[in-house]
């Protein structure tokens, strides 16, 4: 699952990076990744027009990643801006692109409009290519993370739009603190959640309450995930994956035992739900064994 945010920010990002120390850390990484994507299509700078950027850079990058086995594209955009994506026309975005391509310090309002268009374009292309869209959706690292900006309800207009009904959106990390809002959004046919990171930092007893709330209504929309990442010398990916996996299984046991005790489900149904969360739901979504 490659990161794709870099293609949403094709211009000079120094103004955005100056907003706070968190973004000062992230944007140079995005710029480096974008340079590698440009190099892969034998370019050093973005094309002169939006049409050129889409047809020479964005779509070929997505198609190449899909052909190499990617089942989804990941956005960490929550670290870079909020989920308040407007719906500009291609013509509006093209004018902004032409106005600022190759120039320093693009107007922030103009640049946001272009980002909004590019995010939607990439999401639609992912649907065409049968790749899911992964969105970081949990209060994240750093002290400047905008919690209000990642309210998943901000994305509801996109989830409802006919253009994106073929795009499967996976809200990563369970959406904390918006666990109830995200649970309600699971009624959308194109919205899922996974348990990565949340399973690492939230104790099983607390996680079990949220799991039960989701599983009682949308058991086929909840996906096992660990966020097995090398966080530090003391917490490598191995430890992170083990701890998160253990926590999920403990939380799942608590949630399903409670549902059994309250006669909401049978033992066979509990086993089926557990298999779904731990394997089958993700296998069906991503088309993997």
What are the residue ranges of the model-derived segments?
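Divalent metal-dependent hydrolysis catalytic cores, especially in the metallo-beta-lactamase
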Residues: 1-11, 19-32, 71-78
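An acidic- and aromatic-residue-enriched active-site/binding cleft used to recognize and process polar
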Residues: 2-7, 78, 138-140, 174-175, ...
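Short conserved micro-motifs at the rims of enzyme active sites and ligand-binding pockets
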Residues: 13-15, 36, 84-86, 92, ...
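Short, surface-exposed amphipathic charged segments that create phosphate/polyanion-binding patches used
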Residues: 16-20, 40-42, 208-212, 289
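Active-site gating loops and adjacent loop-to-helix segments of metal-dependent hydrolytic enzymes
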Residues: 19-46, 86-108, 248-256
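Short, basic, glycine/proline-bearing loop/turn elements
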Residues: 39-48, 192-199
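Histidine/acidic residue-rich metal-binding segments in metalloenzymes
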Residues: 49-75, 82-191, 205-223
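H/E-rich (His + Asp/Glu) clusters that bind or coordinate divalent metals
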Residues: 150-154, 160-289
């Amino acid at each position: 699952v490659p990161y794709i945010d870099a293609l949403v920010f094709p211009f000079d990002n120094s103004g955005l990076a100056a907003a706070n120390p968190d973004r000062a850390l992230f944007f140079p990484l995005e710029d480096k990744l974008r340079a590698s994507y440009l190099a892969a299509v034998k370019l050093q700078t973005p094309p002169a027009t939006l049409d050129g950027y889409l047809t020479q850079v964005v779509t070929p990058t997505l198609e190449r990643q899909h052909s190499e086995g990617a089942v989804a594209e990941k956005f960490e955009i929550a670290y870079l801006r909020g989920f308040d994506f407007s719906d500009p026309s291609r013509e509006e975005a093209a004018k902004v692109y032409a106005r600022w391509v190759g120039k320093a310090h693009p107007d922030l309002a103009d640049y946001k409009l272009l980002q909004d268009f590019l995010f939607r374009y990439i999401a639609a292309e992912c649907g065409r290519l049968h790749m899911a869209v992964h969105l970081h959706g949990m209060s994240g690292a750093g002290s400047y993370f905008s919690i209000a900006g990642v309210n998943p309800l901000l994305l509801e207009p996109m989830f409802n739009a006919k253009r994106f009904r073929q795009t499967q959106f996976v809200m990563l990390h369970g959406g904390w603190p918006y666990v109830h809002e995200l649970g309600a959004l699971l009624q959308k046919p194109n919205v899922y959640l996974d348990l990565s990171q949340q399973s690492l930092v939230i104790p099983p007893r607390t996680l079990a309450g949220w799991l039960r709330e989701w599983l009682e209504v949308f058991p086929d929309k909840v996906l096992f995930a660990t966020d097995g990442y090398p966080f530090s010398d003391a917490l490598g990916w191995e430890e992170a994956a083990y701890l998160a996996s253990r926590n999920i299984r403990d939380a799942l046991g608590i949630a399903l035992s409670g549902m059994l005790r309250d006669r909401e489900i049978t033992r066979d149904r509990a086993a089926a739900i557990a298999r779904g969360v731990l394997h089958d739901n993700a296998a069906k979504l991503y088309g993997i064994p």
